[in-house]
């Protein structure tokens, strides 16, 4: 090891000077050979008192938990302060954005309500006009039906009046009998199944 250090220290003067490495006391590396006096030595760990070991282990555990809790508390406090510092500006910005978005949505809602109201009014007007037209058509059809019914009844009345002229009444009974007797027309005949007329 000293030879390697000496080789590192002995450099030509053309290069910049480097700090001189000196051997120091300390642990050997795993690649260094053991001393001659310690070849074959078996190291035995010192005896440990179980009660003392348990107490030390418990105290170290408590110490680690306490330090971990303090570290976590300090970390949370620092993060909370950073968050509050950032959230102050962000919260104000978000509030402003929310107000602006709310105003835009309210304006859009008013425009949409106005448009829907105009469409509703136009639809109601069209429906009212359609109902009026339908009502007028129904009245005209009803009037035509009534007029046709009146004409039919008038025709029936005229027909009955024409037929009533040939009715036999008490006043014209004798005259109709005389007329039938004086008529040369004979009703004494019949029709067979074959359609032939048989006269007597």
Curated annotation (Swiss-Prot):
Pfam families: MRP-S26. GO terms for cellular component: mitochondrial inner membrane; mitochondrial small ribosomal subunit; mitochondrion; nucleoplasm. The keyword Flavoprotein does not apply. This is Small ribosomal subunit protein mS26. The keyword Transit peptide applies. Coiled coil: none annotated. PANTHER family: 28S RIBOSOMAL PROTEIN S26, MITOCHONDRIAL, SMALL RIBOSOMAL SUBUNIT PROTEIN MS26. Keywords: Acetylation, Mitochondrion, Ribonucleoprotein, Ribosomal protein, Transit peptide. Component of the mitochondrial ribosome small subunit (28S) which comprises a 12S rRNA and about 30 distinct proteins. The modification N6-acetyllysine is found at residue 159. It comes from Mus musculus (Mouse). Belongs to the mitochondrion-specific ribosomal protein mS26 family.
């Amino acid at each position: 090891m000293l030879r390697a250090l000496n080789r590192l220290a002995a450099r030509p003067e053309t290069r910049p000077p480097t700090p001189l490495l000196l051997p120091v006391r300390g642990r050997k590396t795993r690649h260094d050979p053991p001393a001659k006096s310690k070849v074959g030595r078996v190291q035995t760990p010192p005896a440990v008192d179980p009660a003392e070991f348990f107490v030390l282990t418990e105290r170290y555990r408590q110490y680690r938990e306490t330090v971990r809790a303090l570290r976590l508390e300090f970390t949370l406090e620092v993060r909370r302060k950073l968050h509050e510092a950032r959230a102050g500006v962000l919260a104000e910005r978000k509030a402003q954005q929310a107000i602006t978005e709310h105003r835009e949505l309210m304006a859009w809602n008013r425009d949409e309500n106005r448009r829907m109201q105009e469409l509703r009014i136009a639809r109601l007007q069209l429906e009212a006009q359609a109902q009026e037209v339908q009502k007028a058509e129904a009245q005209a059809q009803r009037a035509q039906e009534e007029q046709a019914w009146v004409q039919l009844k008038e025709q029936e009345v005229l027909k009955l009046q024409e037929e009533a002229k040939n009715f036999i009444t008490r006043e014209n009974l004798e005259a109709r009998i005389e007329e039938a007797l004086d008529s040369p027309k004979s009703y004494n005949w019949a029709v067979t199944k074959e359609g032939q007329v048989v006269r007597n």
